[in-house]
Amino acid sequence: MACPSLACCLLGLLALTSACYIQNCPLGGKRAALDLDMRKCLPCGPGGKGRCFGPSICCADELGCFVGTAEALRCQEENYLPSPCQSGQKPCGSGGRCATAGICCSPDGCRTDPACDPESAFSER
């Protein structure tokens, strides 16, 4: 009689300990978040021609970057969206991405970076 009840207790404990206790697990488990495609960040700037690179940074190819200006106000909305986003094509600097010609931006700010210069891709031959 003790064996069946012991087996039931062990199965019950196993079921309880294998549950996910983290309340904000992504659908499909913890590793599923790595498989998701990053969405493009919100459009910003004049005519919506730019993309957000941080909560107060908006960059557009033709216009350059706006940091802390009215053009970048829309970028603050990214803080309230549940999924991460990514702007820019090529990684650069320390956790940044190329925003415009010669400019590398991360959520912390922008700086010049020769890796983002479109002419440098052709001059390295």
Swiss-Prot record:
<dbReference type="GO" id="GO:0007204">
    <property type="term" value="P:positive regulation of cytosolic calcium ion concentration"/>
</dbReference>
<dbReference type="GO" id="GO:0042713">
    <property type="term" value="P:sperm ejaculation"/>
</dbReference>
<keyword id="KW-0027">Amidation</keyword>
<dbReference type="GO" id="GO:0014823">
    <property type="term" value="P:response to activity"/>
</dbReference>
<keyword id="KW-0165">Cleavage on pair of basic residues</keyword>
<dbReference type="GO" id="GO:0031894">
    <property type="term" value="F:V1A vasopressin receptor binding"/>
</dbReference>
<comment type="subunit">
    <text>Interacts with oxytocin receptor (Ki=1.5 nM). Interacts with vasopressin V1aR/AVPR1A (Ki=37 nM), V1bR/AVPR1B (Ki=222 nM), and V2R/AVPR2 receptors (Ki=823 nM).</text>
</comment>
<dbReference type="InterPro" id="IPR036387">
    <property type="entry name" value="Neurhyp_horm_dom_sf"/>
</dbReference>
<dbReference type="GO" id="GO:0042220">
    <property type="term" value="P:response to cocaine"/>
</dbReference>
<dbReference type="GO" id="GO:0045472">
    <property type="term" value="P:response to ether"/>
</dbReference>
<comment type="function">
    <text>Oxytocin causes contraction of the smooth muscle of the uterus and of the mammary gland. Acts by binding to oxytocin receptor (OXTR).</text>
</comment>
<dbReference type="GO" id="GO:0050806">
    <property type="term" value="P:positive regulation of synaptic transmission"/>
</dbReference>
<feature type="disulfide bond">
    <location>
        <begin position="41"/>
        <end position="85"/>
    </location>
</feature>
<dbReference type="GO" id="GO:0005615">
    <property type="term" value="C:extracellular space"/>
</dbReference>
<keyword id="KW-0732">Signal</keyword>
<dbReference type="GO" id="GO:0002027">
    <property type="term" value="P:regulation of heart rate"/>
</dbReference>
<dbReference type="InterPro" id="IPR000981">
    <property type="entry name" value="Neurhyp_horm"/>
</dbReference>
<feature type="disulfide bond">
    <location>
        <begin position="98"/>
        <end position="116"/>
    </location>
</feature>
<dbReference type="GO" id="GO:0034695">
    <property type="term" value="P:response to prostaglandin E"/>
</dbReference>
<dbReference type="GO" id="GO:0060406">
    <property type="term" value="P:positive regulation of penile erection"/>
</dbReference>
<dbReference type="GO" id="GO:0051384">
    <property type="term" value="P:response to glucocorticoid"/>
</dbReference>
<dbReference type="GO" id="GO:0002125">
    <property type="term" value="P:maternal aggressive behavior"/>
</dbReference>
<feature type="disulfide bond">
    <location>
        <begin position="52"/>
        <end position="75"/>
    </location>
</feature>
<dbReference type="GO" id="GO:0007595">
    <property type="term" value="P:lactation"/>
</dbReference>
<dbReference type="GO" id="GO:0060450">
    <property type="term" value="P:positive regulation of hindgut contraction"/>
</dbReference>
<dbReference type="GO" id="GO:0009744">
    <property type="term" value="P:response to sucrose"/>
</dbReference>
<feature type="disulfide bond">
    <location>
        <begin position="20"/>
        <end position="25"/>
    </location>
</feature>
<dbReference type="GO" id="GO:0032094">
    <property type="term" value="P:response to food"/>
</dbReference>
<dbReference type="GO" id="GO:0070474">
    <property type="term" value="P:positive regulation of uterine smooth muscle contraction"/>
</dbReference>
<dbReference type="InterPro" id="IPR022423">
    <property type="entry name" value="Neurohypophysial_hormone_CS"/>
</dbReference>
<dbReference type="GO" id="GO:0051591">
    <property type="term" value="P:response to cAMP"/>
</dbReference>
<comment type="function">
    <text>Neurophysin 1 specifically binds oxytocin.</text>
</comment>
<dbReference type="Pfam" id="PF00184">
    <property type="entry name" value="Hormone_5"/>
</dbReference>
<dbReference type="GO" id="GO:0045778">
    <property type="term" value="P:positive regulation of ossification"/>
</dbReference>
<dbReference type="GO" id="GO:0010701">
    <property type="term" value="P:positive regulation of norepinephrine secretion"/>
</dbReference>
<dbReference type="GO" id="GO:0042756">
    <property type="term" value="P:drinking behavior"/>
</dbReference>
<feature type="modified residue" description="Glycine amide">
    <location>
        <position position="28"/>
    </location>
</feature>
<dbReference type="GO" id="GO:0009612">
    <property type="term" value="P:response to mechanical stimulus"/>
</dbReference>
<dbReference type="GO" id="GO:0030141">
    <property type="term" value="C:secretory granule"/>
</dbReference>
<dbReference type="Pfam" id="PF00220">
    <property type="entry name" value="Hormone_4"/>
</dbReference>
<dbReference type="GO" id="GO:0032570">
    <property type="term" value="P:response to progesterone"/>
</dbReference>
<comment type="similarity">
    <text>Belongs to the vasopressin/oxytocin family.</text>
</comment>
